[in-house]
Amino acid sequence: LGASRLGPSPGCLAVASAAKLGSVYTEGGFVEGVNKKLSLFGDSIDIFKGIPFAAAPKALEKPERHPGWQGTLKAKSFKKRCLQATLTQDSTYGNEDCLYLNIWVPQGRKEVSHDLPVMIWIYGGAFLMGASQGANFLSNYLYDGEEIATRGNVIVVTFNYRVGPLGFLSTGDSNLPGNYGLWDQHMAIAWVKRNIEAFGGDPDNITLFGESAGGASVSLQTLSPYNKGLIKRAISQSGVGLCPWAIQQDPLFWAKRIAEKVGCPVDDTSKMAGCLKITDPRALTLAYKLPLGSTEYPKLHYLSFVPVIDGDFIPDDPVNLYANAADVDYIAGTNDMDGHLFVGMDVPAINSNKQDVTEEDFYKLVSGLTVTKGLRGANATYEVYTEPWAQDSSQETRKKTMVDLETDILFLIPTKIAVAQHKSHAKSANTYTYLFSQPSRMPIYPKWMGADHADDLQYVFGKPFATPLGYRAQDRTVSKAMIAYWTNFARTGDPNTGHSTVPANWDPYTLEDDNYLEINKQMDSNSMKLHLRTNYLQFWTQTYQALPTVTSAGASLLPPEDNSQASPVPPADNSGAPTEPSAGDSEVAQMPVVIGF
């Protein structure tokens, strides 16, 4: 009777039994996750959700170590995201107590895993939104680490960090130095370094990877002196610390605007800081709104609460900090139409077959993106980018040019500079770069569409395998390749060698060849390419850079309230001087942050 109650005899169970972690001892106490069986053959994955890596943070203060807990912490469900505005920006969701991480550990049959490479994910979302688990599709979270962990045989960690004003508000001095979200990220990385061995990870083989604001965060973490010895490798997808949106040059301007909205003093930063720290954090979060309608300047200028050069976590302009990353293997790359998401907000006609874009539309976009160099900057940029229009001025060509412009400024050129900087400072470290060009799967987009911003995420996280109904065989091909490159790199520092086979050899980047891997569904020996948009790189780094600056990068340009300002017009024949957006009475902090939904 007893045996029948217990089910099959132990002998039958032996086939299905798998190694699993059970209760794990960490610095805070014991944690227990869930072991999920993956096959009849005994493969499984241990999943821990919601382990605290820091104490509940105090508003606008650095995070502190967690005091620990009694008994065993049941780590079985995702914690809420950090407090942030909803997409409609009229209310908040999430919690102030949000500094938790999640861990996926792949297990074989015989013994629990040990010495596995560790991959820590940093989400994007303009430093304004986002969560460790990402959006939920078909009851599968975007940043679920299972596919990467099991296919690449690596441990995957995701975590929350503070965003928006609570993560990045700064007075630009010691009263509110800012970068709280970056300190949160650092705390998570340091916690993993100290504790991951108990989960079967190799604390000396940690790879950071992230996209958009997360890619820029990865970059900034490798450049900060505080992470010396913590990070072995890093991958930045569509975002580096040199992107114009990744550093706020005039944080006090935006801090004052928040202070005014919530009724705090603005003339004394010490009093302002004291007042802001005791203000309802929900009110602080809602005091900033990203304008979603039509705006005087490109959206780039309104992304305000982002990292700052604080002289501490980021001791200098990031371009000068690459010696700190000399021993970190690095991959950085972009999507071929990363700028499309932003042009779609700045010039909605771009996505409509029925609407044309004019030379004036393009010139206005150029002017808004070249404010620091004034009229000469706008005219020089307009001339370089419209040169191909002499042969072909079709709507498709014009719209693609607009996408190229924002892709270049916001993503590609900064990434190319970052890769060159890394390479020229690297000692033993490897450098690789890529261009992701698998066309967007959004049916509403134009037929000329390439890979939009954030299109790479679904492939890196294995969605074509996790939710196969929504995908085709070719999508699984792309996903398999990306997971193979990413996890091989995490294991060995070389994307070609490790646990998985790859479809094409990815050569290390050299300054001479300016070589990169093009990633899409058709990969073979021709996938390595040379000199991506080199003439545009030269334009931005030499010609444009040499022009006199008319408003400093920190100058705040406030768009006129009544929108009465004359629109800029393109030069007719290089003689007509176009009216320039007035910088004097205007307001947008120069180039800050980006969105990776």
Curated annotation (Swiss-Prot):
GO cellular component, one term: membrane
UniProt main location, coarse: secreted
UniProt xrefs under InterPro entries: AB_hydrolase_fold (IPR029058), CarbesteraseB (IPR002018), Carboxylesterase_B_AS (IPR019826), Carboxylesterase_B_CS (IPR019819), Neuroligin/BSAL (IPR051093)
Alphabetized UniProt keyword annotations: Disulfide bond, Glycoprotein, Hydrolase, Lipid degradation, Lipid metabolism, Secreted, Serine esterase, Signal
Disulfide cross-links: 82-98, 264-275
Residue ranges, annotated region (Disordered): 553-591
Protein name: Bile salt-activated lipase
